[in-house]
């Protein structure tokens, strides 16, 4: 855009657009000079292009270019700065070329289209990035961006998009040009006060950074801010990674830009982190600091470099404070997290553990190449530990407390050295098959040296950590042979402990302390561990109540139990209700054992029939019983075993391979009679039927006394889950025959069958609606509640914004004319 600027004050400038011709004259022309009598009606013609302006003289008194008179009818090409005089009086102008280069910021696409049309109408152009050639910055509202900082430092006006619409209209209608101050946008920065910000052109901003060197640590940061630094008179310099120019860094005129302040999630290598720390140490040693990117904009807005972009000053504003540099490794490697169990209401499972505090003495055990990991102590306060020892545990105790217990896996193989010494001291019967047959009641040695050698962590059993919970799923008798080993130990030990307490609750009811159960560690050096088989927990104690005549074994078991009852107890005492229940069950089992012994004498002749088939099974079960618990069990497990079906007994007995080393003739005979009584009894005479009726009564009495309703250790409130396939199969319908029988000799008149209309036989079963409702809707209740609250908050915010927009929207309705 070219412009004829009058040399005398008070005159109006004339805009010359490219591609048009302008006639200078006194009447009926584009450029009127009415106050000069030496101006002809058609004095001269100006032809405007992008590069130059051509002048053709057609006047009477002449036209002068830089003081030289043009000949009449001649043509002269004019350049920027030429002085032109029309006539002989005071119609003097200077030719100037004004390039309108507009940069836009925060303008939407529709606004850019309109803005570009207005700028092209006055001979300008629209650019997307700021350069030194830009003359205007267009923003709807002022936000502190790199373009805003550059426009302030270059003293360029910041205007609204409406400014160029008014400029285009003024040029076309030859009206006075609009002023940029009237189209200045408002500030839209919450951290800046409108009264403190001056967006007008102030020349001191051009030299705001003069004499300062801005040292950049990354090339991206330098590319983004170097234009703003150069607009303020500063010098930009990139510091190579690893370089430490001490003299440059220690200078007070050097502004070291913080590399992390501009990035929300910087990715810094360890070498770069070490280099940044070295640069920071050099700065702190001289009392200097890093400069953040925001300080460049604040210095340009406030026209001051005393506080901002001054490494010697300290900032109190939170918005420009330097952020500490963290290594990326701390996100995943230097964070200590305690693995804790969730609260009971969220898991819907309540698990408790007993006090298993580790001894202060150092423990040592000989593993002979086999490693085992013990349990860690429970993290509780001393007061909580004392209360746990003195109070009985219940299923509802402390549902919200958090316990930290590290679960470990115990090897199925045993420690040979420990087992051999314990076998000699305790006198207990241990199986030589190379597997743990069951828990053996033992007393911890009183000697301190022996404890250090053979009792790591006081031989804590797995039952301390795998207590039966009321939320466990019931197991079928056929599936117990393949259950995991730790769970098998837990259930087996619990049953054995209950049986011992029931047997001796009458004679030793004054005892209030509970027993400490430890996992029997079997020695299996001569056998292969791959031949280990799991038995049912009820079969392990099958022969306990059928030996009333074995006086020697009974005395040995009584001495062993007295030895156990006097030991220290770490397990919490049982409740009074459980003791009373076990007392009653013990008396009942004693009576049942006497009745069952009388019945076995009557049916002894029938038991001889299946002697050969059950011989191997009874010997294996007898050996297993002698190895696990001895004769110190009640008749309750015997009645439970008698309720099993013949396939179960045969399946479990066949799993035990190899003969037993310890055999007693009397026990073997009794066991044969019992197995034949259960398996091979047939209604041959009245005596057998009577014994079966008595056995049914005994089974009912045993079930009523030790049923799942009265036994607190059995699981309750179980949930049965069934997986159904939601498919619909079309039922095959038989094709109805014709109404009339077909005779091949008759004439074929009408032989067709009408087809029923769909829906005639009833609507099909449609799976939908309530059939597809999820079973457990409370599983994601917290997530659904959070989503619902978020949706309500969003609707509330939208409603408030709508009310605010309606409040400030001004749409007056025109009044109706009457």
Curated annotation (Swiss-Prot):
Composition skew (Basic and acidic residues), residue ranges: 603-612, 663-675, 793-808
Cross-referenced PROSITE patterns: FHA_DOMAIN
Region (Disordered): 372-716, 729-757, 793-818
Comp. bias (Low complexity): 409-419, 613-625
Entry GO terms, CC: chromosome, telomeric region; Mre11 complex; PML body; site of double-strand break
Skewed-composition ranges (Acidic residues): 549-571
InterPro entries: BRCT_dom, BRCT_dom_sf, FHA_dom, Nibrin-rel, Nibrin_BRCT2, Nibrin_BRCT2_sf, Nibrin_C, Nibrin_met
Domain remark text: The FHA and BRCT domains specifically recognize and bind phosphorylated proteins.
Entry function: Component of the MRN complex, which plays a central role in double-strand break (DSB) repair, DNA recombination, maintenance of telomere integrity and meiosis. The MRN complex is involved in the repair of DNA double-strand breaks (DSBs) via homologous recombination (HR), an error-free mechanism which primarily occurs during S and G2 phases. The complex (1) mediates the end resection of damaged DNA, which generates proper single-stranded DNA, a key initial steps in HR, and is (2) required for the recruitment of other repair factors and efficient activation of ATM and ATR upon DNA damage.
Name by which UniProt lists this protein: Nibrin
Organism listed in the record: Danio rerio
Chain's gene name: nbn
């Amino acid at each position: 855009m070219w412009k004829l600027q009058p040399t005398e004050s008070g005159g109006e400038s004339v805009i010359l657009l490219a591609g048009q011709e302008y006639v200078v004259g006194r009447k009926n022309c584009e450029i009127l000079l009415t106050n000069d009598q030496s101006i002809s009606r058609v004095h001269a013609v100006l032809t405007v292009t992008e590069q130059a302006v051509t002048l053709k003289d057609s006047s009477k008194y002449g036209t002068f270019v830089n003081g030289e008179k043009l000949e009449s009818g001649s043509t002269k090409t004019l350049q920027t700065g030429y002085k032109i005089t029309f006539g002989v009086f005071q119609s003097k102008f200077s030719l100037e070329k004004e390039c309108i280069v507009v940069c836009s910021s925060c303008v939407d696409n529709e606004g850019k289209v309109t803005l570009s049309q207005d700028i092209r109408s006055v001979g300008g152009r629209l650019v997307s990035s700021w350069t030194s050639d830009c003359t205007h910055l267009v923003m709807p509202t002022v936000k502190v961006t790199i373009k805003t900082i550059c426009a302030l430092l270059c003293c360029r006006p910041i205007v609204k998009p409406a400014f160029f619409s008014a400029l285009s209209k003024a040029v076309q209608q030859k009206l006075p040009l609009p002023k940029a101050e009237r189209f200045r946008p408002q500030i839209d920065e919450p951290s800046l006060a409108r009264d403190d910000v001056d967006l007008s052109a102030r020349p001191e901003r051009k030299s705001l950074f003069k004499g300062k060197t801005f040292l950049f640590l990354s090339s991206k940061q330098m590319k983004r801010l170097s234009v703003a630094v150069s607009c303020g008179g500063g010098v930009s310099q990139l510091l190579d990674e690893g370089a430490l120019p001490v003299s440059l860094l220690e200078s007070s005129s050097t502004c070291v830009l913080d590399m992390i302040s501009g990035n929300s999630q910087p990715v810094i290598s360890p070498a770069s982190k070490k280099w940044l720390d070295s640069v920071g140490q050099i700065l702190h040693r001289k009392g200097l600091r890093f400069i953040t990117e925001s300080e460049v904009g604040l210095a340009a807005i406030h026209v001051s470099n005393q506080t901002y972009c001054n490494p010697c000053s300290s900032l109190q504003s939170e918005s420009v404070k330097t952020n500490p540099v963290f290594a990326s490794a701390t996100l995943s490697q230097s964070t200590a997290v305690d693995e804790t169990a969730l609260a009971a209401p969220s898991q819907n499972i309540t698990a408790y553990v007993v006090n298993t505090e580790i001894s202060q003495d150092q423990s040592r055990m000989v593993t002979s190449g086999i490693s085992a990991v013990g349990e860690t102590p429970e993290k509780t306060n001393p007061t909580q530990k004392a209360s746990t020892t003195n109070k009985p545990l219940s299923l509802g105790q402390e549902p919200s407390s958090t316990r930290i217990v590290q679960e470990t896996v115990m090897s199925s193989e045993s420690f040979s050295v420990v087992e051999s010494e314990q076998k000699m001291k305790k006198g207990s019967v241990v199986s030589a098959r190379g597997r743990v047959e069951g828990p053996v009641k033992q007393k911890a040695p009183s000697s301190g040296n022996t404890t250090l050698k053979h009792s790591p962590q006081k031989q804590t059993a797995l039952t301390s950590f795998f207590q039966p919970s009321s939320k466990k799923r019931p197991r079928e008798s056929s599936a117990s042979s393949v259950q995991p080993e730790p769970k098998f130990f837990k259930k087996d030990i619990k049953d054995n402990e209950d049986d011992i307490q029931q047997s001796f609750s009458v004679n030793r009811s004054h005892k209030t302390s509970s027993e400490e159960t430890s996992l029997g560690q079997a020695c299996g050096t001569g056998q292969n561990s791959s031949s280990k088989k799991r038995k049912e927990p009820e079969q392990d104690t099958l022969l306990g109540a059928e030996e009333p005549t074995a006086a020697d074994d009974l005395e040995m078991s009584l001495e062993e139990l007295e030895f156990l009852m006097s030991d220290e107890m770490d397990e919490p005492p049982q409740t009074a209700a459980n003791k009373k229940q076990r007392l009653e069950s013990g008396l009942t089992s004693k009576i049942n054992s006497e009745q069952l012994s009388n019945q076995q004498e009557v049916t002894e002749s029938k038991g001889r029939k299946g002697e050969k088939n059950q011989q191997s099974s009874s010997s294996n079960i007898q050996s297993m019983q002698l190895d696990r618990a001895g004769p110190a069990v009640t008749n309750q497990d015997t009645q439970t075993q008698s309720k099993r079906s013949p396939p179960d007994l045969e399946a479990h007995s066949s799993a035990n391979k190899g003969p037993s080393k310890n055999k007693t003739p009397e026990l073997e005979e009794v066991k044969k009679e019992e197995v034949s009584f259960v398996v091979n009894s047939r209604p041959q005479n009245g005596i057998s039927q009577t014994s079966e009726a008595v056995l049914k009564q005994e089974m009912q009495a045993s079930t009523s006394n030790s049923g799942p309703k009265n036994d607190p250790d059995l699981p309750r409130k179980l949930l049965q889950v069934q997986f159904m396939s939601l498919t619909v199969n079309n039922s095959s319908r038989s094709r109805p025959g014709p109404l009339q029988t077909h005779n091949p000799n008759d004439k074929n008149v009408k032989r067709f069958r009408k087809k029923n209309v769909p829906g005639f036989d009833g609507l099909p079963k449609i799976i939908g609606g309530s059939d597809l409702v999820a079973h457990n809707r409370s599983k994601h209740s917290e997530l659904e509640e959070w989503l619902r609250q978020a949706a309500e908050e969003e609707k509330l915010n939208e409603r408030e914004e709508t009310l605010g927009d309606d409040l400030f929207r001004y749409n007056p309705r025109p009044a109706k004319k009457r």
